[in-house]
Every structure is written in structure tokens, then in C-alpha cells.
């Protein structure tokens, strides 16, 4: 038998062999581990619907649940429960909702039904004053951090609105800020701030002391062009939303680029002015895609999963959504092992 014939015979596959190969591959696919199904109906997504002067609540699948708030704030004294361009929202461990009521230069607190509880802050500079605060986040110990954007500072308050701590001054030195916008926390309580007009991310410890920074202005991947939102994954990886560059960039804690996601557009996974981010306990990422008037949802590998929202004033619609906060049913989140 010739070498050519040997090669031909060796390369042949019988019907029985083909059937066995298909069966093997199918059984292998069935045995591949799959991510457990996450019931996002028990997760709640709170949106500061800035242009409609209200807070909207959805489940994690985008189902509208309810809303509260109305337009107000033409001049002080401002009416409790009314808003003027609310820009940030967070939910504390007790289920209370805190809103950075940016245009009224104050913070408002509501119960989980949207009933008004308290307010604090007036326009100005000082411990109990704000100037267009754009974001807010609840800490594990029951305190809240307010991003006092146009005062270039971060301020901590207790659950009664009493001032505890402030840090940040106008400037570009380490620990100084220039129009900070986004804020996030890691498991150790470290504070991550998007120092927007300084084109960088700054990290502070839980006492507000400067730790480190990274970032440099530019359009290339790895550089920053007006970073706005930030979120910290369970492993310490950082996701940064650049509203001027219409993309998300993923960095390690030292600022080394790991991944870039998105571009300008309206399709799934594209963005037009992404402003705020939130991560759920399972690693799903929610993005406020402001000019596209929608929320986009991504899985832990940053694959597009879902979206919801169109422009309008009806329940479930948006007009320039700005802030996002998450809460969930007791025992819904995974336990740390």
C-alpha cells in the first residue's frame, strides 16, 4: 500500500466513529459548569431620574415598581420631598433611601416606601453646606458619604445627618480634588473617588486619608477623559465610566488597564454619556447610560445582558438619569465562604 493510500485511510472516519465523537462532545458540553441562575427579581435598582425630578425603583430585571418625588426647588426654602435635578441615590442597611438633591444643595432621606424622613444642607461652603452635590453612598457602619462636587470635597454624616468628617480641597495635589463625581467602596472600607476634572482616580482610607492615585488625561485606552462613575468588583478590580469617551475601562487597584468596553452609540453595549455604575453582590454591573435614556446590565464577565428605558415622563421612562443605588431582599446576597 502506498504512502498516499495510508494517509487517506488514516484520515478516514467511519459513521460509527463520527457518532461516538458527537456523543463525546455533547456529553462534554453537558458537563461544563454553568453560572448559577441569579434571581434578579429580588434585587432593587434605584435611579435618580434627574430631568424628571424623581426617584424610580425597578427590580433587577428592569420591571418598574414605583416612584416618588416631584419638581420643586426654584428658591429656598425648599419643600421636603421635592427635587431639583437629583443626581445621586443610595440605600443604607436599614433600607432607607438617601438622595443627593443637587439643585437644592441638600441631602434628603426617605424610608423604603418613599416617605420623607429628614433633610440637611443648604447652599454654601462648610460642614453642613453643599454646592451641587452629585453623588452619595452608604457605608457599612451606617454612615453616608456625600460627594460635594462643586465644593471639591467628600463629607461623612451619621444617620441623623450630623457631620462627622470631611476631606478634599480644590486643587491637583495628592488628596486634593477638582469636581469629584463618582464614589465607591471596597470590602475594607477604602474610598475610591473619580476626581473628574483632574482626570484621575484617587483612593482614600476609611478615615479620609490619601492612599494613592492613578490616571492621566488622554483619549487612548488606559488614559482618562472626564471619568464620572466608578465601581469596585469583589476582587478589587475597578470599573470606571468615562462620560466624554463613552466607554468603560477596567483597571486593577494600581491603575493597570485590564479591559475596555463600549463606544459611542445606541446599540447594546454602546454608550452615550455613561455617568454612574453599580455592582450587585453577584458581580452584575448596572450602567446609567444617560443620553441614551436607559440602564444597561452586564454579567460578571461584562457581557451585555439587558437594557431598559426610553425618554419620557411616564413611569419607567427617563429624562437624563444620573445616579444609581442598589438594595436587595434579606438573604438574597451570597454569603462569604
Q: What is each residue range found by the language model?
A:
Residues 1-337:
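Eukaryotic scaffold repeat domains enriched in small/polar residues
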Amino acid at each position: 500500500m502506498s504512502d498516499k493510500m495510508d494517509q487517506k485511510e488514516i484520515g478516514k472516519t467511519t459513521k460509527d466513529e463520527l457518532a461516538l465523537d458527537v456523543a463525546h462532545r455533547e456529553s462534554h458540553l453537558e458537563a461544563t459548569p454553568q453560572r448559577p441562575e441569579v434571581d434578579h427579581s429580588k434585587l432593587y435598582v434605584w435611579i435618580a431620574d434627574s430631568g424628571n425630578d424623581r426617584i424610580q425603583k425597578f427590580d433587577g430585571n428592569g420591571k418598574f415598581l414605583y416612584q416618588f418625588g416631584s419638581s420643586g426647588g426654584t428658591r429656598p426654602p425648599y419643600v421636603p420631598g421635592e427635587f431639583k435635578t437629583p443626581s445621586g441615590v443610595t440605600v443604607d442597611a436599614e433600607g432607607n433611601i438617601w438622595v443627593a438633591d443637587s439643585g437644592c444643595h441638600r441631602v434628603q432621606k426617605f424610608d423604603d416606601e418613599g416617605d420623607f424622613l429628614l433633610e440637611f444642607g443648604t447652599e454654601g461652603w462648610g460642614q453642613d453646606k453643599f454646592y451641587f452635590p452629585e453623588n452619595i453612598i452608604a457605608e457599612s457602619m451606617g454612615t453616608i458619604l456625600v460627594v460635594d462636587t462643586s465644593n471639591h470635597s467628600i463629607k461623612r454624616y451619621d444617620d441623623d445627618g450630623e457631620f462627622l468628617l470631611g476631606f478634599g480641597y480644590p486643587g491637583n495635589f495628592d488628596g486634593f480634588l477638582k469636581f469629584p463625581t463618582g464614589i465607591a467602596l471596597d470590602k475594607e472600607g477604602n474610598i475610591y473617588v473619580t476626581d473628574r476634572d483632574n482626570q484621575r482616580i484617587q483612593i482614600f482610607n476609611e478615615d479620609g486619608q490619601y492612599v494613592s492615585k492613578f490616571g492621566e488625561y488622554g483619549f487612548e485606552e488606559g488614559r482618562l477623559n472626564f471619568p464620572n462613575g466608578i465601581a469596585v468588583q469583589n476582587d478589587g478590580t475597578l470599573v470606571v465610566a468615562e462620560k466624554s469617551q463613552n466607554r468603560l475601562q477596567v483597571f486593577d487597584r494600581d491603575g493597570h488597564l485590564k479591559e475596555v468596553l463600549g463606544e459611542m452609540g445606541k446599540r447594546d453595549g454602546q454608550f452615550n454619556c455613561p455617568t454612574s455604575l453599580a455592582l450587585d453582590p453577584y458581580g452584575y454591573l448596572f450602567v446609567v447610560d444617560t443620553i441614551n435614556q436607559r440602564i444597561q446590565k452586564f454579567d460578571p464577565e461584562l457581557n451585555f445582558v439587558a437594557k431598559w428605558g426610553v425618554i419620557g415622563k411616564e413611569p419607567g421612562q427617563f429624562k437624563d438619569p444620573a445616579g444609581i443605588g442598589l438594595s436587595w431582599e434579606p438573604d438574597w446576597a451570597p454569603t462569604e465562604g
